[in-house]
Amino acid sequence: MDFTPPQEGYATQDALVCTIYFYAGDIIGDQTRSTGPHISTDSGHTWDHMAWDIVITNAIAVDSYGKWLYCACGNGVLSSSDGGRNWRLNGGWRQAEIQDVKIGPESPLVVWAAGAYGLFYSEDGAKTWTRPGDPQPFRYTDQVLPDRADGDHVLIGSETGLWVTYDRGSTYTRVGPDIPIRSIIQDSRNPQWFCIGTDGRGLWKSLDRGENWERVQGTGDIVNRVVQNPGDPEWLMCGLDRGVGFSRDDGLTWETSVDGFTDNAAVYALLFDKSNPQTVYAGARDGFYVSFDEGKTWHSYSDENGNVVLQNAVIFDLWQGDLYRGDEEKGSTDAGTLVVNTEPPQGEEHRENFEPGYDTRAKALIDYLVNNTEERLASLQEGQHVDLISAIAYIREGRANDALWDDIRAQFQDWGHSMFHSFPAICFYLYTKDYLPDDIKEILRENLVSHYYYRGDTENHWLMHYTALLLTAQTWPQSSASEWYTGRSTQENYDEALGWIKEWTRITSTIGQGEFDSPAYFITYMAPILMLYEFAQDPALKRQAGMVADLLLADMAAESLDGRYCGGHSRMYDDQVVLGAYDRSSPFHYLYFGGIDLTKDIHSWLITSVYGSYRCPQVIADIAHRRDRPYVHTEVKRVRNCMRYSDLLNPPVYKYTYMTPDYALGSLQGGILQPIQQHTWDVTWIGSADNTTLFSLHPYYDSYELAMFFPEDPHMLTASVQSQKSTYTNPDKLNSSSPYERIFQIEDTLLAVYNIPEATNHQHVTLYVPGCLQRTESDRWIIGHDGNVYIAVYHFGDGEWIDEPVETFPPSRRLKIPAGQTAFIVEIGSESQDGSFAQFRQLILDQAAPDLTTTDSGPSVRYTNRHGRTLEYHWDGDVRRLDGANWAFPSDMLFQSGFMDAAVNTGAISIIGNNASRLLDFNTLRIEETPVPSE
């Protein structure tokens, strides 16, 4: 905790500082807006960013010297020891979505950070961190406040209420209301007194160090921020869900002001001007406000020309004071060094056998990408550029010209700040460095080393980010800490990236992916993994990457039907749900397995496959081709990190897929397993159109779903997500999770059961039926056929048929049924299984009608299928029964079928082909191939 205070007489600068989370409606990481900590030296009329252009920032803490600054950020904790002129990124991969940061009373180097994954503590100026009291009794923490009179005494505001520690985090005690805490302050007059603002039960106060609490009446239910006027401690002000509340009598009586605030102006930050107490600043969901009459009336702040400043900025914190302007303290200028493991793992990779024709298929993909770049380059409009990764093929095939080089130079004049920029940049450099002009080499080095990049907030984001960071550190190890955008050494950056990649691999191989089996995002996993396989200097990391590529491809191959990734998916877009040809995993099937034509949608990142040395073993291609008999394939995946509303960080996901030569029926268990883009079940078949798929869904949306996975204020999340995922609230959307949906599937029969409360957004369920299905309707049964596949769907309740506009998607109809308690019963057949369609239809109609019983506890559904098997689902207790006996998913098996076998939490996965079995042991990085006895 020891530190050296600055020498007396150092220069200072009077400043007003705000933290900008992002601009409403913008995509995080977009280069057109500056976010993060901003500084004004003219009382808020003009602003400049203090750190990098793009850094999500929730809070700022400044020490009494104005020298040590800490910012709570999405990427961790930013720290500065020279008044905010130079910064260092801290926390590593274990720290993410930090919501609050505070300096302890002992020293400016003692720092507390509260975030979506708990509480962190540092005694060295944020360079290293611990999680005090781990495992902690809380997860999502929004606020932290160390007692200025006793550094061991700390209050922590979590999503489930207030916690207090008296021993610096060794133990914790729950106190106060069991409601989300949004603000904590300590009274300036008496260190025994505290106030908290809550989301749902207003303002509370304690007069005994936080042990006992009493609600303060008159503030409203949502208090985002509470502040005390330093010059008049009885003057309190609260930021509300709209506008402010203020009291001049220590909280006995309150007034509310919304005058000048927009309807969207939830107030998150408040600050009394230090020189004029009549002036108050407010940071809101939609910008920066000021009051010149003690908070009674407000207006958006403007510059000297009357232009509104920081318009639409989401501002979470404000600070005012004198910033240190003594000597700058940059990171070390010493040349960086890097130590990389050189010890190879034991054993061989066994990659000598792979599907014939690979080189021919790779050449077809290269030609496609070359032609794509040629056409793009010839038709560029102002502001447009060639795709950087597509240009790799253009360059390597000897087609580069001055127009291309000029376009690449122009791209990097306004390069973005997300992992969708850093990853393509390192791919481009490593695959073309032997062809690049020297100035472009330097442009890329400078951008990758010194240009700030946002890590993102999803699994694929982090894999791209850390792959780019590791390969950049490896490529330019001599870069000094002062050159690195993180402010840290090359070795520190490399070690952080390697640490997360290893941890992600461990989790993926033991409890499954979070963004699992997504045709849309498959490329964002394969491309980084293949880059690591190709360019990692660490032979153990190279082996690990190859094994992960094997696992991802085998996972896809087991559920691939003619190149279409079947079953339930974590993330899909509407067009990808219904357009089988628009499947970004299909080109991988084409390249590595063969057997299908080159598909319509080829992502340029496939370049990492065609120019790389990775080869998919024949044993995996065997899985993709072998469809001579039906089989059940089950998997355990995981829900992505749950920040709120879940006892488990990663609840399990259960996948069940029934594969046949003609169709695949696949499902997840239902419920919220992935926000926004979940695709819970469908049947996909080989037929006469692109959209040969049928499924149902409840088009659910709610801040509850979003707040489970995203750290922002739940009240702002729906609008924020809607601005970026425009279909989220659409009642006609084609993908959605829902807490009111459950699935029970046994082979070719499926029950989709719904229990939708009256107050829920969108009171209906949708059945999607493609136009290619030739169907009839009888006694609530929809029975149809296409190709060799027969489909029967029973619906409870009357609905409305809606035709899909042909110009938007391939022809289809949707059956829209008012919900409440309802269900669909689905049976799938085929010519080889059931004979003629007429025979199948008669078998279905001869069965007793499905039964649905509604109760206060939810529906119960019972159905006996054409095979004589009885399926029951009971909402109360989430009970599934097969032929009268309770049925459960094989929850202990990560993969289970004739093609893949792995138990949960073992890290050992067997892949079984026609003639060999391939064992991937992620614990030892050993690969074993053994012959499979012939049948």
Locate predicted features.
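Short coil/turn segments that connect the beta-strands within blades of beta-propeller domains
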Residues: Q13-D14, I20, K67, P108-L109, ...
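A short loop-to-beta-strand structural motif that recurs across blades of beta-propeller domains
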Residues: T35-I39, G76-S79, G118-Y121, G161-V164, ...
